[in-house]
């Protein structure tokens, strides 16, 4: 399974998002520190979930990072997260 699919599957299972985008930005970082042959090392995640209600931005990011701990310990070098509630997302 590719890394983007693993990220999508784990976030979908754990956070029940109303919207989820997983963007592989690895090509933009080719040749930089942490880049891997074949990419799949730099990602952006945009997620909207009602589970974020009442949580600070930091707490939301920590929840996403905890959900993806295995990927962050291995193939993922960089992860940018935008985590919003349904009301914030509009």
Sequence positions of predicted segments:
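A generic structural signal for short beta-strands and their flanking turns/coil linkers
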Residues: 16-18, 39-43, 75-79
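Histidine-centered active-site/metal-ligand motif
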Residues: 29-32, 42, 61, 77
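A short interface-forming secondary-structure element
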Residues: 47-57
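Basic/polar N-terminal segments that are highly enriched at the extreme N-terminus
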Residues: 1, 89-90
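N-terminal first-folded block
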Residues: 1-36
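A short, structured beta-strand/loop element
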Residues: 31-49
